[in-house]
Amino acid sequence: MTIFPSSPPAPRTDVMVTGLGWISTVNSGCGTDKRKPVWDVGIPTIPDSILNSLKGGSRFGRLDLFSQIGVAAVGLALQDAGYFQANPPAATETDRQLRDNATSIALISSTTSSCNLTDRDFYKTVQNDPGLASPGLFVYTLATSFLGEAALRFSLTGASMAVIEPQPHAGTALSFACEELINGDDEVVVTGFCNLFEQPSVAPNFSGALFLVLEKELKKTTRVHAVLNYDPEAELFYIKDQPCPDIFSLCELICG
């Protein structure tokens, strides 16, 4: 019998966390705010200060709530990492040339709730009279709809993907994000979760969104919140040799 040597285990890869942004029912913010995301049941509301900083392009208010919280959290994470400027001045020709050669940024989100509440709201508009179906709701009846909104608003040109998870932990999205940085074409990946659950809900089904900006090599002069050590064989994450089974424990270590 021929015995073939086993392949050596894949080496761990270091990925830098350069941005963090979240929207929850308790608080909202980004990594430089020096505070932790706090999660609880209920429906999130987005502070006016955050809405004002994210306006630009299409009207924010026309989005369904699932998309609003997702786009807002992505924007906060990008601001934190230096890839999006709140209320920027009018673009010059140089700005436009720089934008054309911008860093390729991917967007990978997990979701457990998906856009189920928006689906139900849309169905209500067609129950009695299909001719009155709401096109404004129909465009948001996909879990990926808010990814397109975020890509347009923040000029993201990389890959985008929504991952459906049975439990909200974003582990699959984090793994895909690290794999994209290791083997893909994108230099930066924004990854996390977006959920909007029917109320009343119970833990861990917290409505809200949380996104991280991950980079293998720094593209901007920015703060590094933490170095995430990724084990591709086990699909596990570590910060300073402490295991992080999900995005919540990861943020606990990042925010201190």
Question: Language-model segments: what does each one mean?
Answer:
Residues 1-175, 179-186, 191-256:
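Conserved "HGTGT" condensation-loop signature of ketosynthase/thiolase-family condensing enzymes
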